[in-house]
Amino acid sequence: MSTKPTINKDELVTLFSQIGLDSSKAKETTNNATLSSNLQEIIKEAGAESGCEKSVGLLLYTLATKYPANAMKHRATLVDYIANKKSVNSINLQACLDYLRRTANEELNVAEFEQSCGVGVVITREQVAQAVSDYINKNKSDLLEKRYQFNIGGILMEIKNSLKWANAKDIKEEVDAAILSLLGPKTDADKAPPAKPVKPTTPTAVATTTAATTTTGDLSPIIPAELKPAKEEIKFPDPSDNIQNTPKLLADHLKTTGGKIVTRFPPEPNGYLHIGHAKAMHLNFGYAKKNGGKCYLRFDDTNPEKENQEYIDSIIDSVKWLGHEPCEITYSSSQFDTLYEMANELIRRGYAYVCHQTASEISEGREKMTDSPYRNRTVEENLKLFEDMRLGKFEEGKAILRMKGDMKHPNPCMRDLIAYRIKYHHHPMSGDKWCIYPSYDYTHCLVDSIENITHSLCTLEFEIRRLTYNWLIDVLGLYRPVVWEYARLNLTHTVLSKRKIITLVQNKIVNGWDDPRLSTLNAFRRKGYTPEAINLLCDTIGVTRTNGTTISYELLELCCRQDLDGKATRAMAVFDPIKVVITNYPEDKSEEINAPNIPSKPEKGTHKIDFSRIVYIERSDFRMEDNKDFFGLAPGKEILLKYAYNIKCEKVIQDADGKVTELHVTYDKDNSSKKLKTIHWVSSVAGTEPMKAEVRLYEHLFKDSEIGDDWLNNINPNSLRIIPNAFIDKTVLASKEYDRYQFERVGYFVVDKDTTSDKMVFNRTVSLKENKEKSKSRN
């Protein structure tokens, strides 16, 4: 067991800095009591209290974060290998950890350990160069044909597989040099993006794979450098390598599961899912699907005060919308009988007791590491009192069941956490059968074990709870899943906290849980995002254990544009219209112009739009004075109305204040002039006005990208602008909710649920990426 550090934080920062951690990493480490204690012990074992080489120190730090808890008796040996430079390094350290985890209960076979983990194996630069040369010669014809479009990553992977203990940097440098020698520097053709395939390819997954029915492909080539997320290559252990307290536990588990991967997505039904949950779904469902396993949708419904059927239904709908298919929908509440019996068994084994302290007394005791005065009751007394709790003989808060861990433990989660509390509330699934409900810390791990979960994947804030998770399962003698934590998804310009979202809704800062300015999946759906776009974001960012990483909202928008570009039918809309009269076009004439549904996909067909003597253009597409950077219309200037005719401005009509009210133009039906600037427009049948619709232009809800503690004062007052009477062409007629369009030169829009038979309503999903350049040209 780790001991509590006996030196203060400043001294710890100094100690950790002496082994090579930078100051910020050293300070961050001291905030994690378990990691800090582990690292302090390892430094002592290594004899590095006065410092060491940075390369050694970083290996010791990695050891503190990753060393398997079941193999503590071998830790000092591995520390000695590192401290005395016995050929354990960053290349083979993970192999060492994996070996010790598998053989934790055995005496260390040094020869087998060193052979299995590459200890003492040295791959020279010359060996790397020879392996690269052999590969290049073997694949020379393909390389010469495809040049820099050849999968260079495949070369690196194959060389690494053949030279397992080689330095990855050496491999990369030798491959780069060999490719340059064979092909020479990149030409302009080499730098061009590869041709798009006829059918989209499945994105390369990092520890997961997209579970939606379709995918948009790999975004890597088009992501700007400043938006590229840091991915980590994650390799989870096989179910058969999951060390248990007894071989029988593992054998029984493997017999039940057939050795397959079993994961779960376990939301609490106390609100609507947000985009952070999309990442959790993507990892859990995707990892199981990729490996031929299964994933449960499990509701952790242990708090009846905050849960209701509306949230359950919404969560099921969101999971299906994202394309995930749970093997079964389960509820922690369906295990209440089993959990109750396990609690009694916990009492019988001396690991739980009924406590009557108040919440503040419990908090103080855990902080000061002092025992509850009720901690040493007899088993018989605790069993009777727990039964009295179940029978409703206590008021809420007057009695709780606590797990008897270790009140002196440096990890606060081991200090007698609550297992059961009294709540006289109706439960959406179990009704009024129970008045005692298990806590998350008690329920989560036990239901994982009951459902034979192989990989319990949680966000990093639960890392501190891993010790309690394993402890509770072990003292009850149950099967123990692998627990692995990853960084949660953080997104700029928005909040993902359920508490904060509730505040926004209740204070009517937004219009409900599906307001398009929120981060809920319902909100993104209403805003027009597709499940494929959200899954593409999850696939693009992958998984990482680096906490505090925030993903730019722009990357999400990039994923959305990438997906909608090939799906959204084009239409034209004018938000701030100027009337344009084509003076040489017959007054009573109307015609229909053919326009492509999706210009890049001719197979998607065309649609017809009305054209007559009166058309409308955007006010921002006209200027009294022209310049070379302006794409729009000006006096005496000729431009092209997209898909229609060239027009030339002959006359400008203004009101008393100088505001332009009407333009008179002439058109060239033969479009004699070529390569003119092009603008969008809207018209209608002669003698009628174009269709009108309400358009809602959404911006970020918060002014700053990083949302601080003063978040309510950071609300963007201009996060919603409504265009009540925009002109839109007839393409959108007969549309239904969630139908998506690209309004040409403007952005992507979706039909909102507020649409009626009298008036359509559109929400802006995302602007076109060229909007920034366009706005510059109009200034």
From Swiss-Prot:
GO molecular function ontology, one term from the record: glutamine-tRNA ligase activity
ATP-binding is among the record's keywords: yes
Keywords: Aminoacyl-tRNA synthetase, ATP-binding, Ligase, Nucleotide-binding, Protein biosynthesis
Gene Ontology CC entries for this record: cytoplasm; cytosol
Positions annotated to bind ATP: 268-270, 274-280, 459, 488-489, 496-498
EC number(s) given by UniProt: 6.1.1.18
InterPro entries, alphabetized: aa-tRNA-synth_I_CS, Gln-tRNA-synth, Gln-tRNA-synth_Ib_RNA-bd_2, Gln-tRNA-synth_Ib_RNA-bd_N, Gln-tRNA-synth_Ib_RNA-bd_N_1, Gln-tRNA-synth_Ib_RNA-bd_N_2, Gln/Glu-tRNA_Ligase, Glu/Gln-tRNA-synth
Lineage: superkingdom: Eukaryota
GO biological process, one term: glutaminyl-tRNA aminoacylation
Tagged with keyword NADP: no
Catalytic activity: tRNA(Gln) + L-glutamine + ATP = L-glutaminyl-tRNA(Gln) + AMP + diphosphate
Top-rank EC class of the record's enzyme: ligase
Binding site for L-glutamine: 300, 440
Homology family: Belongs to the class-I aminoacyl-tRNA synthetase family.
Protein name: Probable glutamine--tRNA ligase
Native organism: Dictyostelium discoideum
Gene of this entry: glnS
